[in-house]
């Protein structure tokens, strides 16, 4: 995935930030969001 500078406590926290970044899916890795490009 593509790491973005958004802190998270769970993958759910990354859904919106990833959408806003123009990507989909979000996983929380090491307390940061990682998104999957479209």
Swiss-Prot record:
InterPro entries: Scorpion_toxin-like_sf, Scorpion_toxinS_K_inh. The keyword Disulfide bond applies. This is Potassium channel toxin alpha-KTx 3.17. Disulfide bonds join 8-28, 14-33, 18-35. Expressed by the venom gland. It comes from the Eukaryota. GO terms for cellular component: extracellular region. Keywords: Disulfide bond, Ion channel impairing toxin, Neurotoxin, Potassium channel impairing toxin, Secreted, Toxin, Voltage-gated potassium channel impairing toxin. It is found in: Secreted. Its main location: secreted. Has the structural arrangement of an alpha-helix connected to a beta-sheet by disulfide bonds (CSalpha/beta).
